[in-house]
UniProtKB/Swiss-Prot annotation:
Protein's name according to its UniProt entry: Probable alpha-L-glutamate ligase
Enzyme Commission code: 6.3.2.-
Chain residues that bind Mg(2+) 2: E260, N262
Keyword annotations from UniProtKB, A to Z: ATP-binding, Ligase, Magnesium, Manganese, Metal-binding, Nucleotide-binding, Protein biosynthesis
Gene expressing this chain: rimK
Positions bound to Mg(2+) 1: D248, E260
Pfam families tied to this protein: RimK, Rimk_N, TrkA_C
Superkingdom to which the source organism belongs: Bacteria
Cofactor dependence: Mg(2+); Mn(2+)
Cofactor note: Binds 2 magnesium or manganese ions per subunit.
Gene Ontology CC terms: cytoplasm
NCBIfam families noted in UniProt: rimK_fam (TIGR00768)
Organism: Rhodopirellula baltica (strain DSM 10527 / NCIMB 13988 / SH1)
Length: 405
């Protein structure tokens, strides 16, 4: 396997360890500076140039994209995806993980435990927002920030209001988030590779610091996660579209509360705390998965006229409740169930004899017209109205205004 590691920091611990682990396994790994790429596009010929030379073929790509170059970095990863090269983390997953609001929206939609969070712009909404997340003390976060930068603890409402107003006056977007008191100054970092947690550590802040990030002097200790925490970490990473991720969780009274899913987790802290070869585990995973590059299903299916992918909900009282997928008539309608979601359980490629239950969600591929007819009329989205022609008088006004310009 020929591996490319995308990184602007070839001498940092994580990059050096990945190269070392690859070489120990007889794998040729090269560190490529993400900012030295040029993306070329032509009909049917997506291509990449590196330092002004056409890039040679690589079997796999391990992105280590810094937050400051997210846009360009994800564009490079996306180009590798278009060229059918396996990428450890998808471009979409990296982009989603960098946007704190977007990532929490995705996790919330999939019933992952998160601290109560609100996002406001109007000054009049600030106080009600603080109350909705549980009142003071409250956490205030900038939408973009890493290693604890841009995270503020406001001990009372007046201080919180002043901080939010000040940040908004400088055109900053901020999140207002519940302060999980029982987890003050500590959190858990679970390192996910593929479909399992390979290592986990607890990070504890020093002194009066409430942020437990290692870069802020936080101390670490290895921990063994119970099934609930491990399952939450894996689901969070997979939902975000990340095969290699650091999932940060608070230890709440109601179970794990996911704060963030990191697409470029550092290796030094987790390897030092656990004494495990995490870099080697990443390389081993890539070796096993390199023949299965990311496929943009929706993009591929746009050429299938009249067909598409959608999610069907089995509602209370539906005729499908109690029937198997086979008995539901979906196969006869040329509708294939790709995945069944039941609560927090994901059932890929479910058997036709699987019985449907209320609140099941079915990810289906088939004829759009047939699937549209299965959505109850009261929840069905209205079709887009036809665009009407402007009256002649309006067209005349437009022509005159154009001449004035």
């Amino acid at each position: 396997m020929k591996l490319a590691i995308l990184s602007c920091s070839p001498r940092c611990y994580s990059t050096r360890r990945l190269v070392e682990a690859a070489e120990q396994r007889g794998i040729k790994a090269k560190v490529l500076n993400t900012l030295k790429f040029a993306i070329d596009l032509a009909e049917g010929e997506p291509d990449l140039y590196y330092r002004s030379k056409q890039l040679s073929d690589y079997d796999g790509v391990l992105p280590r994209i810094g937050a400051s170059i997210t846009y360009f970095g994800t564009a490079v990863v996306r180009q590798f995806e278009q060229m059918d090269v396996f990428c450890a983390n998808s471009s979409a997953g990296i982009s989603n993980s960098r946007d704190k609001l977007r990532s929490l929206q995705i996790l919330s939609r999939h019933q992952i435990g998160i601290p109560k969070t609100t996002f406001v712009r109007d000054r009049k909404d600030i106080l009600p927002a603080i109350e909705r997340v549980g009142g003071s003390p409250v956490i205030i976060k900038l939408l973009e920030g890493t290693q604890g930068v841009g995270v503020i603890l406001a001990e009372n409402v007046k201080v919180a209001e002043a901080i939010i107003e000040t940040l908004q006056s400088t055109k900053q977007n901020v999140l207002v988030q519940q302060f999980v008191a029982e987890s003050r100054g500590k959190d858990i970092r679970a390192f996910v590779i593929g479909d399992r947690v390979v290592a986990a550590m607890r990070r504890v802040a020093v002194g009066n610091e409430f942020r437990s990030n290692v870069h802020r002097g936080g101390q670490t200790e290895a921990v063994v996660l119970d099934e609930t925490y491990a399952e939450t970490a894996v689901r969070a990473a997979q939902i975000m579209g990340l095969r290699v991720a650091g999932v940060d969780m608070l230890e709440g009274t109601n179970g794990p509360q996911v704060m963030e899913v990191n697409s470029s987790p550092g290796l030094e802290g987790i390897e030092s705390a656990t004494k495990l070869d995490i870099a080697g585990a990443i390389i081993d995973y890539m070796s096993a998965q390199v023949d299965f590059p990311e496929v943009d299903v929706r993009q591929r299916l746009t050429v299938s006229r009249g067909y598409g992918v959608t999610e069907l909900h089995v509602r209370d009282g539906s005729d499908y409740v109690g029937k198997t997928i086979d008995e539901s008539g979906l196969p006869e309608l040329d509708i294939n169930v790709l995945t069944l979601y039941r609560g927090t359980t994901v059932i890929p490629n479910p058997r036709l004899k699987r019985t449907l239950e209320p609140h099941d969600r079915l990810l289906c591929f088939g004829k759009l017209e047939a699937m549209r007819g299965m959505v109850p009329e009261k929840v069905r989205k209205q079709r887009r109205p036809k665009i009407k022609r402007l009256p002649d008088s309006a067209a005349t006004i437009h022509a005159e205004s154009s001449r004035d310009d």
